[in-house]
């Protein structure tokens, strides 16, 4: 299969100036945050920049709701006007600001303290603010959270590293409730699946499908889980070894650690599993058929692609140089059709030239 360049199928390309650390698509808004603290918003339809601010970096997480953007930035939590980028309020947190989620006017944030002397995290805090930035409650614990998702009861669910590992459930007016998971392996990543399920990836390569009553672990694999996404009841995990594993039973293996996974346009009918890998020198983005893992499309890129963010018809990719590429389903289909036609024309020309050389006795 021919490997195309990422640029050749992108609807537009924009820049942040330093490594992209987070992406979000919300309606016609595409937001990107950088290592150095730039946060920018573009129109998905036109590509026009709507606003751009500079604050302390990195921008670690973003949440959008009710005309606002909430950003975990360096050691702060910011609330911004989604139309202008103006900062409405800012609150300092303890340590690094890691995650933010919003539900029905409640703003949840998580921060962590890293001690250089021992090269480990020593304390984390979950913060609960109202929409005006007033602190309502906070909870402290020893582990860093590697997943921070909204629970259907209005609280949050955290996936923990060592020492306790497992899950931590936090609700307003209650103490934090710890839930061990089978294997007791540190959580490395998580995602929210369908029907209230949480997908939790571990350092031993397992994926746990978690509901209120049960957790169903997959088998161990040779390397940690680095990325997870889902489609319906199926889940897909990306591993440090380069494997992309499906709960449907297939495995795709290629050189380079998997950096990110997302559902996105396939270039034909339906959607595919987008996975970015980095081999230390270049990135390869592979689009896989969800049913059987067959390769639909391969894209090459010279920088590390750490972040993928998608909606039904669009997918955004952010790289280590700060470039953001938006790929739209309709443009991708047209572009791939054009590439195929150009390739066919080139092959026909080559065949014709070969016939002429034979006729001339060359």
Regions found by a protein language model. Name each.
Residues 1-18, 45-48:
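A short helix->beta-strand "capping" segment at the edge of beta-propeller domains
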């Amino acid at each position: 299969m021919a490997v195309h360049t990422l640029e050749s199928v992108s609807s537009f390309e924009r820049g942040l100036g330093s490594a992209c650390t987070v992406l979000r698509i919300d309606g016609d808004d595409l937001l990107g945050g950088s290592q150095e603290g730039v946060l920018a918003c573009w129109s998905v339809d036109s590509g026009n920049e709507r606003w751009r601010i500079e604050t302390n970096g990195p921008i670690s997480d973003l949440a959008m709701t009710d005309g606002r953007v909430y950003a975990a930035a360096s050691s702060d939590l910011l609330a911004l006007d989604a139309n202008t980028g103006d900062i409405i309020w800012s609150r300092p947190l303890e340590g690094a600001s890691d995650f933010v989620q919003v539900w029905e006017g409640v703003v949840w944030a998580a921060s962590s303290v890293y001690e250089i002397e021992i090269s480990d995290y020593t304390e984390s805090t979950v913060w609960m603010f109202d929409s005006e930035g007033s602190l309502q409650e906070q909870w402290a614990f020893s582990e860093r959270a590697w997943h921070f998702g909204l629970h259907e009861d209005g609280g949050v669910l955290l996936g923990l590293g060592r020492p306790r590992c497992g899950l931590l459930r936090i609700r307003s007016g209650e103490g934090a409730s710890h839930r061990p998971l089978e294997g007791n392996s540190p959580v490395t990543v998580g995602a929210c699946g369908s029907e209230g399920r949480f997908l939790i990836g571990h350092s031993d390569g397992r994926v746990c499908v978690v509901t209120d009553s049960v957790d169903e672990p997959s088998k161990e694999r040779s390397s940690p889980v680095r990325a997870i996404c889902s489609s319906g009841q199926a889940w897909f995990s990306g591993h440090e070894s380069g494997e992309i594993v499906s709960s449907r039973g297939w495995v795709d293996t290629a050189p380079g650690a998997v950096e990110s996974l997302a559902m996105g346009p396939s270039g034909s009918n339906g959607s595919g599993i987008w996975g970015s890998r980095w081999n230390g020198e270049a990135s390869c983005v592979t689009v896989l058929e969800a049913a059987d893992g067959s390769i639909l499309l391969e894209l090459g890129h010279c920088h590390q692609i750490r972040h993928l963010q998608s909606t039904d018809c669009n997918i955004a990719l952010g790289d280590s140089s700060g470039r953001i590429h938006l790929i739209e389903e309709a443009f991708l289909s047209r572009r791939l059709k054009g590439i195929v036609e150009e390739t066919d024309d080139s092959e026909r020309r080559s065949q014709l030239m070969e016939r002429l050389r034979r006729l001339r006795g060359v």
